[in-house]
């Protein structure tokens, strides 16, 4: 009986009910579509960055800065002898015994591969164009084990670094800015006075703008000579069995080795903060829409209660309890939430598929030929639960208000 009465009241205000359902539908659809879009761009950035730059970086910086022994002894204010103006000994930053360290790292649980790098900034010139590029000296065979940069080469080949004495693989953005093409010869100059010419043997495109527009690869020996870092390795790249656990692995590795170790999350912390802010903004927008939809439900149920005060009194006089009356009106709110959420889930799926087909060139933090949509079951579940909670809470007040009416007082007031 309670179900029949509730559904009868539910259908009594069709126009207002449809508006409330539409509000819930729009909120759910918007959340699913916006979250899929934000997740698509963040997933693209994370995957491409991780795959092209490695999971963990072991840098040439010591884990702790050592205080010179003379400074410890003779700069004490209570000491009889004091030394001022002590100049620290010039220290060449490098990783000591890199081959031995890499062999040790490869044996650690979770580490699947390790590769040496020497890095530095150089000025690249081609014709009248000049830009600053981060040069990375690598051993091609080892580099392709820790990153997928070889698979990102869209013109030429990464393996040509080995077969070409002066070979250079540059990012798509670097080549575009310079106006250079495959097999063109460009000039590289370092701040230490090193200068050389190199032939472009490959052009890679990861889709991540900071990488494509600022990075170039050359043979390890050639880079060491150019940067005046002969026989120096200043970075070791590690690949793990699960990049999501890179932070935990990095902490373990740093406690073992004497060098600062960064996970990809730490290296890209600023970019990850941007994506977190975007997620928060998405939540605020869809949350605001849900609040509006909830107020719509609240409004229509209050109107329904006020219009049917006499009916409520009659129902109570026939033996319906407060719980029954509460159930009747609460069920109407739940019905609006269920129908609106269900339609919203369907529309959300349709919206994602439509957005995927839109031909649009995007070039910002991530370069793409269309909108990147990342679809997860959690998006649908979250949207459904949030909508149901919001609408149900909105229905509680009018339902309890209806249950509090005293049939005797209502009948007296009616006369």
Task: Annotate the PLM regions.
Residues 62, 174, 182, 187-282, ...:
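Mechanotransmission and gating elements of multispan inner-membrane complexes involved in transport
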Residues 302-304, 310-356, 382, 398:
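Transmembrane alpha-helical interface segments in multi-pass membrane proteins
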Residues 342-383, 396, 400-404:
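Short helix-loop junctions at transmembrane helix boundaries
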Residues 90-94, 98-199, 225-226:
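Short acidic/glycine-enriched loop/turn elements at secondary-structure junctions
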Residues 14-41, 276-311, 334-343, 389-393:
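Hydrophobic alpha-helical transmembrane segments of multi-pass inner-membrane transport and secretion
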Residues 38-132:
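Hydrophobic, regular-secondary-structure patches
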Residues 401-415:
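Short cytosolic juxtamembrane segments of multi-pass membrane proteins
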């Amino acid at each position: 009986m309670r179900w029949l009465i509730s559904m009868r009241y539910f259908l009594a205000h069709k126009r207002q009910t449809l508006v409330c359902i539409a509000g819930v539908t729009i909120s759910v659809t918007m959340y699913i579509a916006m979250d899929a879009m934000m997740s698509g761009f963040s997933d693209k950035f994370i995957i491409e960055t991780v795959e092209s730059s490695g999971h963990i970086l072991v840098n040439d910086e010591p884990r702790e800065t050592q205080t010179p022994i003379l400074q410890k002894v003779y700069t004490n204010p209570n000491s009889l002898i004091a030394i001022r103006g002590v100049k620290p000994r010039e220290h060449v930053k490098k990783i000591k015994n890199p081959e031995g360290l890499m062999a040790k790292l490869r044996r650690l649980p979770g580490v699947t591969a390790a590769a040496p790098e020497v890095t530095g900034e150089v000025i690249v010139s081609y014709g009248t164009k000049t830009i600053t590029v981060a040069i990375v000296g690598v051993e091609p065979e080892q580099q392709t084990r820790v990153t997928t940069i070889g698979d990102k080469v869209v013109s030429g080949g990464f393996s040509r670094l080995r077969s070409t004495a002066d070979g250079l693989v540059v990012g798509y953005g670097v080549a575009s800015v310079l106006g250079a093409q495959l097999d063109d010869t460009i000039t590289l100059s370092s701040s230490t006075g090193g200068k050389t010419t190199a032939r472009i043997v490959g052009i890679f495109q990861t889709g991540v703008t900071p990488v494509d527009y600022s990075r170039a690869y050359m043979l390890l020996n050639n880079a060491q000579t150019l940067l005046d870092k002969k026989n120096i390795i200043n970075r070791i790249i590690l690949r793990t069995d699960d990049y999501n656990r890179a932070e935990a692995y990095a902490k373990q590795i740093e406690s073992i080795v004497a060098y600062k170790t960064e996970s990809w999350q730490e290296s890209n912390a600023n970019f990850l903060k941007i994506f977190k802010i975007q997620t928060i903004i998405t939540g605020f927008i869809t949350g605001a829409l849900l609040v509006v939809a909830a107020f719509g439900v609240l409004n229509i149920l209050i109107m329904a209660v006020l219009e049917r005060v006499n009916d409520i009194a009659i129902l109570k006089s026939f033996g319906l309890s407060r719980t029954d009356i509460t159930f009747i009106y609460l069920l109407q709110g739940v019905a609006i939430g269920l129908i609106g959420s269900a339609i919203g889930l369907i529309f959300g799926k349709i919206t994602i598929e439509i957005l995927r087909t839109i031909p649009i060139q995007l070039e910002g933090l991530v370069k793409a030929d269309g909108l990147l949509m990342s679809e997860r079951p959690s998006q649908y579940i979250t949207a459904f639960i949030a909508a149901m909670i919001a609408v149900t809470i909105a229905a509680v007040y009018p339902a309890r208000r209806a249950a509090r009416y005293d049939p005797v007082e209502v009948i007296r007031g009616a006369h």
